[in-house]
Amino acid sequence: MLNGIIVIDKDKGMTSADVVYHLRRALHIRKIGHAGTLDPEVTGVLPIAIGQATKLIELMHTRPKKYQGTGLFGYATDSYDIDGKVLKEKRLVMPFTVEEIQRGMNTFKGKIEQVPPIYSAVKVNGKHLYEYAREGIKVERPKRQVEIFQYDLLNDPSFDKEKGQESFDFEITCSKGTYVRSLVNDLGEKLDEPAVMTYLRRVASSGFDISQAVKLSEIEANPEKASELIQPIDAFFKDYETIDLPEGKWLKVKNGAGISLETNAKKVALRYNEKVKAIYEKKGKIYRPSLMLLQNE
């Protein structure tokens, strides 16, 4: 059975659940899940956990995500992207400089409180926000704390004098739960000009990047290639201190027992027969199980 992570380069128009469904059919494996939902119109990195790797999904969510996209000053929509209803239009007489846009972006770096878009999957009283929006019901959107590690221009913005609009390409590295289109909208508010996101692509997530990604169609056409394309579970723990277990300690770990280790690391990856079998965490002077991966072969 396959155990590991396949990094999919998701096409526009598909949901993350669609990708999981198609992979289950192509590989004839039920134990498959995705780490980090991508909206249908967003393309790029979607890590898919298979077999024992599904145990990593919660950990995968904790790692930063990186996006590249395009924003536009000139109008704003209710969904914060170009698929929404236009709420405000305002021609730019003079374009923003690189310095002005970057200065605005810098104000969002660090830990911030963010209000999710009304057209989002966030739930209020057991109901998705987009369901309230479709029914025309106003509801208070809950603020959430997210962290923005990077929000930068990728190149010089482009000004269309005839339309009075200015487009800009950006790169964002952020924590889970961040709505990038909200950051584009909020940048517009910061600079007192309506703004909308016109394009978004995720280029890294959960420690994997777009260079490791494959198209879903490639796997569907050649399911047997999945074993060549899959990232081993051990690759996810490349930043952990790894300790090879002698037979005696492996027998203890296999039974979930605490063990002593000659290290000061808070968490360690324990390996046996060249495979990570468990993640142990320091509890006082003893290391105890945090995540068991005994079937990682």
UniProtKB/Swiss-Prot annotation:
EC number: 5.4.99.25
Catalytic activity: uridine(55) in tRNA = pseudouridine(55) in tRNA
SS bonds (residue pairs): none
Keywords carried by this UniProt record: Isomerase, tRNA processing
Gene Ontology BP annotations: mRNA pseudouridine synthesis; tRNA pseudouridine synthesis
Transmembrane segments: none
UniProt keyword tRNA processing present: yes
Molecular function, one GO term: tRNA pseudouridine(55) synthase activity
Enzyme active site: D39 (nucleophile)
tRNA processing among keywords: yes
Gene3D superfamilies referenced in this protein's UniProt entry, alphabetically: Pseudouridine synthase
NCBIfam families, per database record: TruB
Function comment: Responsible for synthesis of pseudouridine from uracil-55 in the psi GC loop of transfer RNAs.
Family: Belongs to the pseudouridine synthase TruB family. Type 1 subfamily.
Protein's recorded name: tRNA pseudouridine synthase B
Organism: Lactobacillus acidophilus (strain ATCC 700396 / NCK56 / N2 / NCFM)
The encoding gene: truB
